Swiss-Prot record:
Residues 76-98, 122-157, 160-194 form the EF-hand domain. GO terms for molecular function: calcium ion binding. Potential calcium sensor. PANTHER family: EF-HAND CALCIUM-BINDING DOMAIN CONTAINING PROTEIN. Coiled coil: none annotated. Residues 64-81 have a biased composition (Acidic residues). Residues 52-63 have a biased composition (Basic and acidic residues). This is Probable calcium-binding protein CML45. It comes from Arabidopsis thaliana (Mouse-ear cress). Residues 52-81 are annotated as: Disordered. The gene is CML45. Keywords: Calcium, Metal-binding, Repeat. It comes from the Eukaryota.
């Protein structure tokens, strides 16, 4: 009888594993997607600077305009273009990311922004942030309802059924309390990704 219940929870564990991996890949793709905004923000800064120097632009000859266009192509590799605090706030708000005012610098160089999106091993703090995405009521546990909420938000139909979520929780629940605590979550993350 036990082998039957463990074999029926195996596909659900695999499903949960798939959902979690998909979620992490989504986060990674979002980071990569956002890294593509750096050139856009650089271009925006150039356009803004050009508008402020309108008088100077009017005095340029056609030859100088062509040279400037060529120089703009060369400037793509330069790190001298900054992103303002307001631009960083706008991007973070549009992504639904929250921040404290003291966490943001007045300006960021293109190199600093680019380094935010480099691939690196997840730190314990990043794993905690991922755990907090699931732990809506902040009680230190992920229960089936919280898991269901996240999987539904991510668009997984199987996650919309509470019974499926209960089976997923049971498959990871080492102490059999019906919830996943942070240590169980870390253990799952270590076995899934490392």
């Amino acid at each position: 009888m036990e082998s039957k219940s463990s074999s029926s929870s195996l596909p659900l564990f695999a499903l949960f594993n798939f959902f979690l991996i998909s979620f992490c890949r989504w986060v990674s793709s979002t980071r990569i997607f956002l890294s593509r905004f750096v050139p856009l923000l650089q271009h925006h800064q150039r356009v803004f600077d050009k508008k402020n120097n309108k008088d100077q632009q009017e005095t340029l000859t056609k030859q100088e305009d062509d040279d400037d266009d060529d120089d703009d192509d060369d400037d793509d590799d330069d790190d001298d273009i900054d992103i303002s605090r307001e631009e960083a706030e706008m991007v973070m708000r549009s992504l639904g990311l929250f921040y404290n005012d003291d966490q943001l610098q007045e300006q960021y160089s293109a190199k600093e922004v680019s380094s935010l999106f480099e691939e690196k091993e997840a730190s314990l703090e990043e794993v905690k942030q991922a755990f907090d995405v699931f732990d809506e009521n902040k009680d230190g546990f992920i229960d089936a309802i919280e898991l269901q909420r996240v999987l539904t938000i991510l668009g997984f139909k199987q996650g919309s059924y509470l019974d499926n979520c209960l089976v997923m929780i049971r498959s990871l629940d080492g102490n059999k309390d019906g919830k996943i605590d942070f240590n169980e979550f870390v253990k799952f993350m270590e076995t899934s990704f490392y």
